[in-house]
Amino acid sequence: MLPTFRLMTCAIVFVLPGLGHASQCPDWPAAKARSEVTALQQQIAEWDDSYHRQGISQIADELYDQARQKLNLWRSCFAVSTPESDPLKTAVGPLPHPVPHTGVNKLADEGSVKGWLKGRNDLWIQPKVDGVAVTLVYEKGRLVQAISRGDGRKGQDWTSQARLIKAIAQQLPQAESTILQGELYWRLDDHIQAASGSVNARSKVAGLLARQTISPQQADAIGLFVWDWPNGPADMAQRLAGLQAMGFEDSAAYTHPLENYVQAARWREHWYRNPLPFATDGVILRQGQRPPAQRWQASAPYWIAAWKHPYAQALAEVRKVNFKIGRSGRITPVLELTPVRLDDRTVSRISTGSLQRWQTLDIRPGDQIAVSLAGLTIPRLDGVVSRAAERADMIIPRADDFHELSCWQATPGCESQFRARLAWLSGKKGLALPGVGPGTWNTLIDNGQIMGLLDWMTLNHAELVNIPGFAERSSAKLLDSLQTARERPFQTWLKAIGLPPTGGARLPDNWHELAGRSVEQWQAEPGIGPGRAARLRAFFQDPQVQALSQQLQAQSISGFK
């Protein structure tokens, strides 16, 4: 399969649908643009060196591709005069390829694929095997040289490693001079790309081939997919038959004639969702007829194109970090993103899971993160890919300031937790007030009608009808809904205002009896340990909670009298 990963990045041309540069360009002053472009370029150069010189992949290939696309976009947005980086500058070896390795155009979407197919004939399709590219040189049928792709013109000598790999024939049936180009891949059993992704298969092969020696067991785990025979027959069918006669069965088994876009989409979907012996990251479209090998160059030609699988991971830019504080005081950082597509979903927000994880990752606006879908539906933060050159200052809430007994009023800094308390109070696990949700509370708070958790109990029609968004009818409907709270039983009210979990404890319908229990008395109840007993005692003794009980007593709510 044509090597369309980092082993040939300098020869890749990204065919993108109408970029609309103006709408995608960041709103940066010149100095910031220069520093951000330089920082991303340096990060990519570090990845390139690690991969090509050390055989270590620090980043998934699809994220690398997206990072390069972003770098190219930024350069075009700001005309930054940083020197163009060569991703293969550390991959060049001493051995010249007898025939250069060409690159491949990457087609971004359905329209690009249809455009490439239009007007062409003698078309074929293959899976785009996720491996590392190699040239195999045979003289009189005997393997004499194996060369890494390098920069497409020169590569490293892999001959000693190739001698150990059983998938590479040491002697061909025909005693002829033969040049083959193909992909060395990590063997997998019934690998389904859509379910398992690339499982770092290509990096395993790259890492082994970067070593001086590999064990027989490691060598046996490497397979070969021959995707071209530069000095073979001009006709594609004849080339495939010849490769099959040489013993390269996979080339014929996985290469099929192609007539139209529908067939291309069908094969792409089939190879994405059905078992294969190797990882893939798309399909290769190629014309059967191509120029003589003497005319090949280490650049993307017109007769080959790649159509990649949907991204399993997307590169997303963080626009803002919001700190969502729940009713119990738990702080959850939520990242606002420049929207990205994953499968058929648009992802614009993602949670870091916890404040501790956010602190560990230290994600700031401008950082580039990796996002995937957990279970194919839920956006998941996989990690930081690169950081903004300028680290944004942020106001970060202190974990010690928020807990089960904080933020009973809409005071500065308490907005998030207080609103979460109200949402819980009116929700299904609280008072279950019909038609009352976060939007209702936000409107009432923003218009100064609610400052404390139970202020809504004293609202009247005259106060509501003058609030924007509350007409005569909606005001009456809201008051009717709020009125139903008075009918709720005592224990429902306890949960609604934030009672900690009580296990199997007895809960008499009397506030004063519960408030009078000591830690030891709580601990004597079923399912109550020392920690929970202390929490329950603290809840009932908290001055803010006691003030709530007095308000409910004044409103003649059952159990609080």
Curated annotation (Swiss-Prot):
One of its GO terms (molecular function) is DNA ligase (NAD+) activity. Its EC number is 6.5.1.2. The keyword DNA damage applies. InterPro entries: DNA_ligase_B (IPR020923), DNA_ligase_CS (IPR033136), DNAligase_adenylation (IPR013839), DNAligase_N (IPR013840), NA-bd_OB-fold (IPR012340), NAD_dep_DNA_ligaseB (IPR050326), NAD_DNA_ligase_OB (IPR004150), RuvA_2-like (IPR010994). PANTHER family: DNA LIGASE, DNA LIGASE B. Belongs to the NAD-dependent DNA ligase family. LigB subfamily. This is DNA ligase B. It comes from Pseudomonas syringae pv. syringae (strain B728a). The lineage of its organism: Bacteria, Pseudomonadati, Pseudomonadota, Gammaproteobacteria, Pseudomonadales.
